[in-house]
Amino acid sequence: MTIHWCGTGLSSIPGLKRLIQLGYPVTVWNRTVAKAEAAIGSYTTDIRAFDMAAVQASLQAGDTVVSMLPGDWHVPLAKAAIEAGAHFVSSSYIAPEMRALDQKAKEAGVAVINEVGLDPGIDHLMAHHLVAAYRGSNAYDVANRVSFTSYCGGVPKHPNPFRYKFSWAPVGVLKALKSPSTSVRAGEELTVTKPWDAISSYTAPLPQPETFEVYPNRDSLPFMAEYGFDPRWQVHEFVRGTLRLNGWA
């Protein structure tokens, strides 16, 4: 079994280092070998130039492909993994084209796993835990008015001009700003094409409270069902959003 780790960008290195340090057989693929060597070369010498044909030729049944490349590569890599009888992992949102591979993956007996980062990923676990705890509490009543907010964002220690800590490809951050969002505000669906049209203020309940700018991220609505919301609930607010330092907008 070999782990084929594709991409050595900003968010790749901690997980990649850990796998290598734990002794797992890892082959690193990157579009620029020199950049990968600079980032991870002290941990492994098995670094290869990323090329779809080369990756496909190297895949064997039981291998795992981890895609930390830009989103356009996820589906082609997942298809290649399924065809080879290998598993696939990414931290990105599940695109419709990725979801369409579900049955093929099941028939091949392999796992195709996405949304396993911080957001999306760990936030899903926390949301499921929160909803389950609410359902099991004495406060639960199907007639209650329910509000759910989940915010995540990279915050620099010292404010920079972009008011954001880049932990993944800057071009990806900018492209995300072009995605429309849908959420629930005051019991009504709110759809905006530009995030800055739905900015609000959020005070984080920290030991020393701090206020941030927040805005809805993508389409929040499907996550109500995924998190176990009862269709009968009166949802006053449901937002999965992005957090930024004040002054971002």
Where are the language model's segments positioned?
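N-terminal Rossmann-like NAD(P) cofactor-binding module of classical short-chain dehydrogenase/reductase
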Residues: 63-68, 89-90
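Rossmann-fold NAD(P)-binding glycine/threonine-rich loop
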Residues: 92-114
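NAD(P)-binding Rossmann-fold cofactor-contacting core
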Residues: 26-40
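Rossmann-fold cofactor-recognition segment
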Residues: 42-54
